[in-house]
Amino acid sequence: MDLRTGVPITAAQAANGVFIWELRNPLYFKIRLVETPMYTRSRVFHIQVRANHNMRTALGLHKAYFNFQVWTTLTTISGQIYLNRFKLLVMFYLDNLGLISVNNVIRAVSFATDKRYVNAVLENHEIIYKLY
């Protein structure tokens, strides 16, 4: 859903993409928080994937934040190490696909979190398209 207007994003807007070799550093990965809930054997990584300026202009986006909450059973790994692994898997998927779009970023995250040590993934997206 477009955050500014409240209008649902159409399939054409979500599938609109650009070749990945035309963009330098299309995505910016940031770890926002690492939680270790008490009395559990799990760790929660709050990861934000942002579309870089080059990608936003190519796709006609004003703002594109993909927020993910990844619940894992990894208790000994640090946030930065998991972020590097997550980024590597997402970029590996997108490089093999060759096309980057809103749908493909979500599919790449699904690929990166489809591991035995990931219990659940919660998603929240802040996407705003340019109106002018």
Curated annotation (Swiss-Prot):
Q: Which Pfam families does the record associate with it?
A: Gemini_AL3
Q: Which UniProt keywords apply?
A: Host-virus interaction
Q: Where does the record place a coiled coil?
A: none
State the Gene Ontology BP annotations. Answer: viral process
Q: Which domain of life is it from?
A: Viruses
* DNA-binding among keywords: no
Briefly, what is this protein's role? Answer: Increases viral DNA accumulation. Enhances infectivity and symptom expression.
The UniProt subunit note reads as follows: Homooligomer. Interacts with the replication-associated protein (REP). Interacts with host proliferating cell nuclear antigen (PCNA). Interacts with host retinoblastoma-related protein 1 (RBR1), and may thereby deregulate the host cell cycle. Oligomerization and interaction with PCNA are necessary for optimal replication enhancement.
The entry sums up its family as follows:
Belongs to the geminiviridae replication enhancer protein family.
Q: What is the protein name stated in its UniProt record?
A: Replication enhancer protein
| Organism field | Pepper huasteco yellow vein virus (PHYVV)
